[in-house]
Every structure is written in structure tokens, then in C-alpha cells.
């Protein structure tokens, strides 16, 4: 795949050219990536892969995907909306999709005028859990097709987690996301491993966390847990908890988190 988006129009393609690993009859056409490139005059060289939310049971693509990508593009950042597989697919399938997306952007970096050392991942709600998993978990070897894309690193250079699901075991856990992500026969140990406050290391990339105090769907304790783990491991991190805003706020009009994100990106 060597085609680049033209005339400011996005380019959509499936992540694997031929056979998608672990594919089944569900969710035909997924996983796929839609890439938005900024104008040459504004291009910062940074790229952000966006994982929409949806509790690992659907994807909120318009609000937490394409709208975010267009916003980032207007500010000079490349963006790619990842439509990853969700239930009935369970872990590690969404993570395999996210890692392939990161490797794909890195493989296309020269053609798409992206700095391969400035590729980050962003996620909302359960998509924030997926982005956080990509930022903390090692490369998944299962399902690799060993093409030129798979030779690239799957580690993101930064992460932006917006009202993310973090824990699958803490009282603040979002049980719907946990039930959709984990096979019903999964051991408790796997839920502990996928509680991302337990997965942070000194190698975790710099992370921005966004949450609101009014979020009752995924309480802000999720972001607090992750931030505390980042601090413990001396990972550069910023946490913004705003007073107003319900869960799933997206880029609501006049909400300040979008501006805070751009400022944080400028400092990377």
C-alpha cells in the first residue's frame, strides 16, 4: 500500500492487504484505517492514531474518530482513525489491530511526511484502554504476517487518553468494557494484567490524560490510577480533570480540553 491521501481527502484501507489474522465471519471490513494528512504548509510531522470508544462492543467513529482527525489535521497533525475489531472478538485482537496501525504509519512515514519518531496513539473511553494497552504492552507476535510493515516498531511515541477505561478490577472499572474485551472463560489474572495501572513501566511513552469530574460512566479515578503509576515510574505525564462534562463529551463546543491537547502536542 503506497497510495497517499489526495487533495485533502482521507484515504481508507484495511490494515492487511490479504488475509487478516484471526478473522472470522463477524465485523466484515474491519480492521481498517482512515488517514487524514495536513496541508504541507501546516505539517508538524506528528501523527496520531485515534481509537474511538464504544465499550469494546461498538465504535463511536463519527464523534470520537473522524471529527477528532479533522480537528488535528486543521492544526497541522496527521491523524488516522482506527476501526478496530470488538466483541465478539476478545483480547488480544484489538491490540493486534492497534499495533498493526502504528507499524503501518511508521512504514508510510516518508511518503506521508510523518516523523517516524513522532507517532502517537489516542483513545476515548474503551478506545482509551486500547491506546493505553498499546502504550504499555509489548509487541504481540501472534498473527504477524512478516511483511515489510511487520518489521516496524509497534511502540507509540506518546499517548493521549481521553476519559479512558484503565482498570478492569478496581471499583471504578467499567464492567461492560471488561466483559466485552475478555473471553467469558478468561482467568482473573488476565483482568489484572489488562488493568493498565499495573502495566506501566519506565518505558511507557509520555502520556496526556483527560477526564471530567462529572463522568459517571467511566469515573475519573481511572485516569488518576494511571497517572499515579506514570509518576511512580517517572514517565512524563500530564493529567487534566475538568469540572464539567459528561462521559463521551468528545470535542464539545468550547470545552478547553482540545486546546490543552494541542499545547501538550506542541511540547512533544
Predicted regions: what is each one?
Residues 18, 164-199, 205:
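Mobile cap/lid helix-loop segments that gate and shape the active-site cleft of serine hydrolases
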Residues 36, 220-268:
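C-terminal catalytic histidine-bearing segment of alpha/beta-hydrolase fold enzymes
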Residues 44-53:
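Short beta-strand element of the alpha/beta-hydrolase
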Residues 60-62, 66-67, 80-116, 251-256:
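Catalytic nucleophile-loop/oxyanion-hole region of alpha/beta-hydrolase
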Residues 168, 214-218:
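Acidic catalytic loop of the alpha/beta-hydrolase fold
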Residues 203, 209-211, 215:
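Short beta-strand/loop motif that positions the catalytic acidic residue
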Amino acid at each position: 500500500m503506497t497510495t497517499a491521501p489526495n487533495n485533502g481527502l482521507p484515504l481508507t484501507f484495511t490494515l492487511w492487504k490479504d488475509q487478516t489474522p484471526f478473522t472470522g465471519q463477524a465485523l466484515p471490513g474491519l480492521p481498517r484505517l482512515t488517514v487524514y494528512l495536513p496541508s504541507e504548509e501546516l505539517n508538524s510531522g506528528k501523527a496520531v492514531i485515534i481509537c474511538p470508544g464504544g465499550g469494546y462492543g461498538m465504535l463511536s467513529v463519527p464523534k470520537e474518530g473522524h471529527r477528532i482527525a479533522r480537528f488535528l489535521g486543521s492544526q497541522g497533525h496527521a491523524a488516522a482513525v482506527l476501526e478496530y475489531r470488538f466483541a465478539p472478538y476478545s483480547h488480544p485482537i484489538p491490540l493486534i489491530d492497534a499495533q498493526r496501525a502504528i507499524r503501518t504509519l511508521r512504514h508510510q512515514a516518508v511518503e506521508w511526511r510523518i516523523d517516524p519518531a513522532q507517532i502517537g496513539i489516542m483513545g476515548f473511553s474503551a478506545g482509551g484502554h486500547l491506546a493505553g494497552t498499546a502504550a504499555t504492552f509489548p509487541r504481540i507476535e501472534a498473527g504477524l504476517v512478516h511483511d515489510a510493515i511487520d518489521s516496524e516498531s509497534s511502540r507509540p511515541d506518546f499517548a493521549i487518553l481521553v476519559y479512558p477505561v484503565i482498570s478492569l478490577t478496581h471499583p471504578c472499572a467499567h464492567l461492560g468494557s471488561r466483559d466485552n474485551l475478555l473471553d467469558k472463560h478468561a482467568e482473573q489474572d488476565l483482568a489484572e494484567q489488562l488493568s493498565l495501572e499495573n502495566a506501566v513501566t519506565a518505558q511507557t511513552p509520555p502520556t496526556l490524560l483527560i477526564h471530567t469530574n462529572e463522568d459517571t460512566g467511566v469515573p475519573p479515578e481511572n485516569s488518576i490510577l494511571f497517572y499515579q503509576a506514570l509518576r511512580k515510574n517517572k514517565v512524563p505525564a500530564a493529567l487534566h480533570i475538568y469540572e464539567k462534562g459528561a462521559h463521551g463529551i468528545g470535542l464539545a463546543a468550547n470545552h478547553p480540553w482540545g486546546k490543552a491537547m494541542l499545547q501538550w502536542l506542541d511540547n512533544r
